[in-house]
């Protein structure tokens, strides 16, 4: 299993104060020196709430690890990434809403202009992945557009798992739609969410599409996903950075790697 470390929220801390620390390159080399991280993931958002264009340039110039850049189909961002001298190892196209706190679901593959953006990256020799819900239609769209990777949105699975097996439902930011559900109902929905991820991962495998997954994964809910044999990569960020605040980034990375690289 490949471990993609998302370091967006290292930069979130920097941007809150509009200062120079924490240094994104230091985080990069801490990750590299653990010898457990396979790639670095960053999300270049339209509103630049964390990662900035300059961060992209610096990372691509010196990173010893592959860089996966998440982004929308925004024209300015597409043009910027296509113009880069140092190319990312892949671009993962994600949906984006300026009012969202974080990505809320998978990409709508009927989105106008999506095919053109995929072709623009392919023409520059940049591999494309699509951040999608685990659905057949998304896989067929990927196949039709010569996209060799998808990343399944695991938010539904992760939220249900957290509601059942953590104190998430007792916290200030509990998800209202899950808070009042009984454990039996949550277990059934969680089981169905897992089965859907497993079914669509198998489907993708037989279609020749590499399957990655991410969103909302943490030290507890990630374990079940390791039972999906066709899953090749997990991208995890917020939970690792959250733990790093308390125990340090190196230890937080190693603890996650111990779970997913068994």
Swiss-Prot record:
Gene Ontology biological-process annotations: pyridoxine biosynthetic process
Site (Transition state stabilizer): residue numbering on this chain: 151
Catalytic activity field: 3-amino-2-oxopropyl phosphate + 1-deoxy-D-xylulose 5-phosphate = pyridoxine 5'-phosphate + phosphate + 2 H2O + H(+)
Transmembrane domains' residue ranges: none
GO MF term set: pyridoxine 5'-phosphate synthase activity
Binding sites annotated in the UniProt record for 3-amino-2-oxopropyl phosphate: 6, 17, 216, 237-238
Subcellular location(s) of the protein: Cytoplasm
Main location: cytoplasm
Signal peptide range: none
The enzyme's E.C. designation: 2.6.99.2
Complexes and interactors: Homooctamer; tetramer of dimers.
Family: Belongs to the PNP synthase family.
NCBIfam families given in the database record: pdxJ, PRK05265.1-3, PRK05265.1-5
Function as written in the Swiss-Prot or TrEMBL entry: Catalyzes the complicated ring closure reaction between the two acyclic compounds 1-deoxy-D-xylulose-5-phosphate (DXP) and 3-amino-2-oxopropyl phosphate (1-amino-acetone-3-phosphate or AAP) to form pyridoxine 5'-phosphate (PNP) and inorganic phosphate.
Name of the protein in its database record: Pyridoxine 5'-phosphate synthase
Species this chain originates from: Helicobacter pylori (strain HPAG1)
Lineage: Bacteria, Pseudomonadati, Campylobacterota, Epsilonproteobacteria, Campylobacterales
């Amino acid at each position: 299993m490949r471990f993609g470390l998302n370091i967006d929220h290292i930069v979130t801390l920097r941007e809150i104060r509009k200062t120079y620390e924490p240094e994104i390159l230091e985080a990069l080399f801490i990750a590299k020196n653990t010898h457990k991280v396979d790639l670095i993931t960053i999300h270049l958002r339209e509103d630049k709430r964390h990662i900035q264009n300059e961060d992209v340039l610096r990372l691509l110039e010196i990173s010893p690890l592959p860089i996966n850049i998440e982004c929308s189909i925004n024209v300015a961002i597409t043009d910027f990434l296509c113009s880069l001298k140092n190319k990312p190892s892949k671009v993962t196209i994600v949906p984006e809403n300026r009012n969202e706190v974080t990505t809320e679901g998978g990409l709508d593959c009927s989105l106008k202009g999506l095919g053109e953006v995929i072709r623009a990256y392919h023409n520059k020799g940049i591999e494309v992945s699509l951040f999608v819900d685990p659905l057949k239609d998304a896989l067929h769209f990927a196949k039709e557009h010569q996209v060799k990777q998808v990343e399944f949105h695991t938010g539904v699975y992760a939220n249900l798992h957290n509601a059942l097996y953590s104190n998430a439902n007792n916290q200030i930011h509990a998800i209202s739609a899950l808070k009042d559900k009984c454990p039996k109902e949550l277990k059934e929905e969680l089981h169905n969410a897992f089965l859907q991820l497993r079914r669509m991962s198998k489907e993708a495998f037989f279609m020749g599409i590499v399957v990655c997954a991410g969103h909302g994964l943490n030290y507890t809910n990630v374990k079940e996903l390791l039972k999906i044999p066709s899953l090749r990569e997990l991208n995890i960020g917020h939970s690792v950075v959250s733990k790093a605040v308390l125990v340090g980034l190196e230890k937080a990375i190693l603890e996650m790697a111990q779970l997913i690289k068994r």
